[in-house]
């Protein structure tokens, strides 16, 4: 017996190891997170990560630049936090993974803001200066928001497309693709916004429902004899009539120059009260009903027989200015799904119309193009000059009616193109623009841009995989890229073009380099103020400065050139490992970057593309002001903490829509608390543990501790495989299960007795603490990519001598001998424990026992279950959290059972176990023999648990 004298005071004489930790139960995230943001910045944590990562293999996530305009919204938060999780997880996986954030700075939205604030009459130099200042102000505002979300990066030196070096390198990239033969100038219908006064990129177009007039119009016979012969008739039985078209754009009728028929569709000559009408045979019945006519088909012929016939313009009778005829051209794009099977062609206002007319010999100068950039007809247009096309629509209908050419006029609801900025309808409009040719043979005679880009898509990894087919289809079907824009605040297409021929100056490549050098020093303003004579001397009499600017998608689409290999080449490299954006960027940044890199380098600028969905409310509805269902990330961060936003994003399958609501945030917060409570338990029970002095080698651990570490190591391997594939939601799901079930529901539950009641420095307790130390090392690191604030807070308590968790790599768990067999055995034991817990709960419900420690259980088991249980010996009771446990072998699984009885022994005051030896020591009548030994002797001996 020990000679220790026990204190006679009952509360002080039987202490248990209930320890505290400075890691609080309440996260108080809205208050603490901003302090961490300041701390990370003040101590240069991002720079420390970079220093720690030197010499490792590079991993480059290239930031797709948000536009420098407006506050950050929830979509920004999703995007930036996903990127942050990727970068942090790659750094911890042993890579050098820098994060250089960037901003898209030129373009229409900022120019519109300047116009709103200062009017439209500012000199160009002032527009530039104010646009730069505005973009800078917006960047600083957004930067604060991104940092508040816990995103670490090169915030002191981000890339900006408006930085002089980036602007200059973009001009050099333009020179390269001209040199390679991809760029040409031509008249083509492009997406045109009247409010922007400029061409739009495909990615700047959105579709909205709209109601427009729909009309069926008669083009009268101009060659009745030829028409009769085409239908196999000697002559037409009557002179009245013609060919019928259907359109939803009456405003294009004044510019009609042709009619398109499908060569293989059968067309009918129909005798009606309105004369002879030509239309597709399979549309006759529907059209007669729509027109309110009765008709009889008197002849049929395939479309090819009608080629080159001419018909009078439908407004010829309304004004002499329309006394012209329209030829019939053949086109495979004509269908009979709707309308009459005849398409009226205004080549200035439709891509297929334009292509067809050009293919049939029409020159650019032949094309009638009366709509100006502001949406008004030129003043000289007969009947409608000076009107906007939308105001002209009803007047054109009236004029057609007066001319006897209108067969039907109704309203038609359909999905129509709109400008993504102004939300106003746009049109196709033929303008002289600079294009990158998708099917143009490059100067080296190699593959076309389309072929190269499609090959690059095939060579790219997609997350999720369906993105490959989507981008492939977009590239396969897209038209030539309209590179030019008619704005001020943009990188100039710094060409000198011949005043008469429009040809580029023969020294264009050399001149572009000269301009780039000036832009490098002074920004794009250098081009605005440049006197042409400075560069081309007397040639300035023949050549003028091109006024077009580059599409802003070329700005961001060449960041692989002017950022990865330009402004930040010391940190980054080409190609990037990953581009990560919303799924709309298949037709945006992913797309433009692919095309520019295909032209410049013959490959994609990325090895992988990751796309995430958009945020929706709890009912799956898109967030909008009208529905009032928007959620502001600032408000959530200030109320619940940015950590809750991070955990919500990490726990959601980003490949689809990301649903968020107050109810969802409540569930996320509850999940966060469970993780935090687990960390608090771990840290508290390690607060008197010094790994260097107190740790035991794995061979001396109790069996359950070896199992716990083996299990944690196995889990980590699974988690790292998910991280490798950017699968974050399974990481969160498995870690939440680990914290709540594997740790809280089992291992830590079993461990409490040993941690609290064993002698502080006993091998049994140090075994448990050594295992907890390893589990905590591993757990904090796998949490860090998404629970960054919490992992850092816990790490500073756990490893106070370390600067930050973010310079660590994933933990190397100690090797556990026979780990696989150990995990299998304890999986079986946990299964049995589940049966016992159920039986204990039934006994508690029946008021046969109070707590589980009041119970003594007998487990009847067979086979491997018996072997596993029996191997624990007397430690089985600790695993089952009962005061006594015995195991009885039975022959068959069907004979297995759990018997629960209330203990008849007294309860130990200290450990709360019911034991026969409580009071065995007269000086300590309320203490069991186990606790007496742990307090005053050498302590109990355990082997398993």
Swiss-Prot record:
GO MF, one example: ATP binding
Enzyme Commission designation: 6.1.1.5
Needed co-factor(s): Zn(2+)
Main subcellular location: cytoplasm
The protein's enzyme class: ligase
Keyword Aminoacyl-tRNA synthetase appears in the UniProt entry: yes
Note describing how the cofactor binds: Binds 1 zinc ion per subunit.
Residues that coordinate or bind L-isoleucyl-5'-AMP: 581
Gene Ontology cellular component annotations, sorted alphabetically: cytosol
Keyword Protein biosynthesis: yes
One GO process term, biological-process aspect: isoleucyl-tRNA aminoacylation
Superkingdom, taxonomy of origin: Bacteria
Short motif ('KMSKS' region): ranges: 622-626
Assigned protein family: Belongs to the class-I aminoacyl-tRNA synthetase family. IleS type 1 subfamily.
Domain notes: IleRS has two distinct active sites: one for aminoacylation and one for editing. The misactivated valine is translocated from the active site to the editing site, which sterically excludes the correctly activated isoleucine. The single editing site contains two valyl binding pockets, one specific for each substrate (Val-AMP or Val-tRNA(Ile)).
Function: Catalyzes the attachment of isoleucine to tRNA(Ile). As IleRS can inadvertently accommodate and process structurally similar amino acids such as valine, to avoid such errors it has two additional distinct tRNA(Ile)-dependent editing activities. One activity is designated as 'pretransfer' editing and involves the hydrolysis of activated Val-AMP. The other activity is designated 'posttransfer' editing and involves deacylation of mischarged Val-tRNA(Ile).
Protein name: Isoleucine--tRNA ligase 1
Lineage start: Bacteria, Pseudomonadati, Pseudomonadota, Betaproteobacteria, Burkholderiales
